[in-house]
A protein has these predicted regions:
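Long, K/E/R/D-enriched contiguous segments that form extended
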Residues: 72-185
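Extended, charge-enriched "interface" segments that sit outside catalytic cores
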Residues: 23-89, 93
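Catalytic binding pocket for nucleotide-activated donors in carbohydrate/polymer assembly enzymes
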Residues: 6-9, 14-54, 190-191, 198-237
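Short, well-structured alpha-helical interface segments that form or flank functional binding sites
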Residues: 5-8, 98, 105, 169, ...
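Hydrophobic alpha-helical scaffolding
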Residues: 20, 24, 64-68, 106, ...
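Short, basic, glycine/proline-bearing loop/turn elements
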Residues: 170-171, 193-196
């Protein structure tokens, strides 16, 4: 075991993201909200965001409701965009549970889909969620990665089944967006309520999607792996 011999040679190298694209450009409303509290220093120095963690801000209900208004606005914008560009109809008042990333077995989109099948069967039994859920997937598979393509096929089949089931549709919606890319991610990330970061523990070196979602106010649902570990340490439970 090389770690026992040279523990100092084994350490993490965290990736990073650019605020210019994933906050300033993607979510100008949230940018203005933050600037109103702490100025614009955070645009060049992420450490400035720590100034938000003060009782004056965290216990200000009026401002916290403003955050909810911004999130609702971005969700409505996403719903309109998907309707106009892809013909996909989603409920902007539902919980947006989003998993967008490269399609790979270790990233476990298939596990997310299996949970949604379980949720579908629960609703059929009469166990309806108190708040509707919209599960959104965005991914592309490598050309020769057959299993990844099969997972996409499974998600699309689930989407079609739910779309044709009037008993389930009001409570659960599954969407696989077409041609997932950066432009679409700029719409999806600010609208997200729950960020799915469920890669198999020990397989994710860092990840950056988790950072983009966290920056835009989503709650992370994830394994204790990659940059999720550092996010957990900073944000807590």
């Amino acid at each position: 075991n090389f770690y026992k011999l040279y523990p100092e040679k084994f350490n993490n190298k965290t990736n990073g993201i650019t605020f210019r694209r994933w906050l300033l450009h993607s979510n100008p409303e949230l940018t203005d909200f933050i600037t109103g509290f702490i100025g614009d220093g955070f645009k060049k120095d992420a450490e400035e965001l720590k100034k938000l963690d003060t009782p004056v801000i965290t216990k200000n209900l009026k401002q916290l409701y403003r955050l909810l208004d911004i999130k609702a606005q971005k969700k409505a914008e996403l719903a309109k965009y998907l309707e106009e560009t892809q013909g996909i109809t989603i409920n902007p008042d539902s919980i947006f549970d989003i998993q967008i990333k490269r399609l790979h077995e270790y990233k476990r989109q298939q596990m997310n889909a299996l949970y949604l099948i379980h949720k579908y069967l629960e609703i059929k039994k009469g166990k309806k969620p108190t708040t509707p859920i919209t599960a959104i997937f965005g991914a592309k598979a490598a050309p020769a990665y057959i299993i990844a393509k099969d997972i996409i096929h499974m998600i699309l089949c689930l989407q079609q089944i739910i779309d044709k089931d009037p008993e389930v549709k009001p409570y659960l919606n599954v969407v696989m967006v077409n041609n997932y890319n950066v432009t679409l991610a700029e719409k999806l990330i600010p609208a997200c309520d729950i960020s799915e970061q469920i890669s198999l523990a020990s397989k994710e070196a860092s990840g950056t999607g988790n950072m983009k979602f966290m920056l835009n106010g989503a709650v992370t649902l994830g394994t204790d792996d990659g940059a999720n570990v550092e996010i957990h340490e900073l944000v807590g439970d």
